[in-house]
Amino acid sequence: MAQYSLEKCAEFAANPHLRAPLSAFTANPRMRDPALYRPSPELAEAVNVALHLGIPLLLTGEPGCGKTELAWHLAWYFHLGEPLVFNAKSGSSATDLFYQYDALGHFQYSQNHAEALSPDELERRFICYQALGVAIRSDGRRVVLIDEVDKAPRDFPNDLLDALDKLRFDVPELGKSYHTSDANRPVIVLTSNS
């Protein structure tokens, strides 16, 4: 079995707050058992290099060859909970990785209610955090799967690299900024079919 090194996993073994429950893996019948996934030695080495350098891992290959399953396997292996998944689409932008703002819903609400919402209420009602936003706001390390980046617009990869490099984002609607520490840097797996 391949052995990975996330700083030899010592931080995770020593800190129970960084270990997420594994029930999500058994509750999702669509995914194969991540404990049974067996990466090649070359793939295990690529994972170790990406983890050591703190950079995203880009996996390319034909549909069904196991790219997505690697993210599930890594989450299982490091006890990081269910991977946070972002499925790239033809209209995706880098901002979509962090959050979505329901501007129309907020507008409709403001037309029907005279009182202004508090930032917390605005966030609760009209902001939906996405995979990378959830990971950055998380108290522990997570696996983020950015699936099928080849389906996104041509400028998406450049915007994505910038977003992944900074691991911070602003929510101007709330006047808030979020960032993560190196200790909580998410394990990021990108997949592409081409």
Residue ranges, per PLM feature:
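AAA+ P-loop NTPase catalytic core and its hallmark functional loops
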Residues: 1-194
